[in-house]
Amino acid sequence: MSVKHHVYLVPGFFGFTNLGELLYFGHAYEFLKQDLARRGIDAEVVTVVSHPTASIRQRTADLLKAVSETASGDDGPIHLVGHSTGGLDARLFVSPGAQVSEALELEPFARRVRTVVTVSAPHAGTPLATFFLGLFGQQLLKLLSLFTMYVLRFGRLPLSVVFRFGHLMARADDQLGWKATLLDQLFDQLLGDFSSERRDAVTKFLWDVGRDTSLIPQLTPEGIDLFNGGTHDRPGVRYGSVVTQARPPSLRTRLAAGLDPYAQLTHTIYAFVYGQTQRMPLTQLPLHTPAQTAALVQAYGAMPGPTACDGIVPTRSQVYGRVLAAVRADHLDAIGHFDQPAHQPPHVDWLISGSGFRRPQFEAMWKTIGDFLMEEEPPR
């Protein structure tokens, strides 16, 4: 009798998996499920619903709830794949002695975990979180969340919205003349295009983002230091990471975006978040093992510098355990949100980075993840 594997996809802080057709892991879920089936593996792949910006402990409790609801019927092995902050949730889940929920016991499930894979996760934090701590940053975080959901639902943001937002980003560093009413107007314009039912769901999601932002200070380089001090690897669990590095914004990347005004303006948004993320303090960069360093050098031709990032998380902050893949991609490319509308179902992108990441690289990356998950499974 074959052993049933339980694979959990854990979202980051854009974790809108509960909004109907707006699927955070849509393409990754379908590909991984089909890939495991092709291998003859009996596996259930589950996308986890978590509070988007709640604390890592609360998000890990959400993960525990999902696992208890779907993996209690047997004692099969459990595998955790976390994108962005979801990678930190996965690490806390298996940390010996972790206490995340008064209602559910963690240890019976944690001891069944065989692998933890983190994708573009901020193991050493990200300076972008420091920016999001401010009032302007908090409003911007909600708007970026809405942008992501809008693009996945409708394909593109209205050009008028992108133009106004791009103008705002050009002045964001000094914030002179910034008025909350402009962001409110952008919210209202975008929400008006959703159906009444979907608008209510999106509004609730955004309200949750604004109500509980406990996660944000935990993701700063200083905040993550405390997390790492209290979170430990579990013996017997295999840890692997997928690392992403995007091209820094430049004249070349602007030219690569072409003449499309939409691509040019959304590239402005990418340039802004990249500029915030690349401010990683040298003292906060983690030391890597020789094997990790060799993997990065082999993939990128040289060791990524301290400013290298995927637009959201510094590249060297993403390394944890075995480096399974190091790819040239932005933060959302890694989960299938890149520009390839001809594919069915289409891949849709709003963070135009000019990374060049497309379906072949996406499939190769997720196949590597599948290889790692089933590394100790006997061939069929």
Task: Label every model-predicted segment.
Residues 1-380:
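Lipid deacylating catalytic domains
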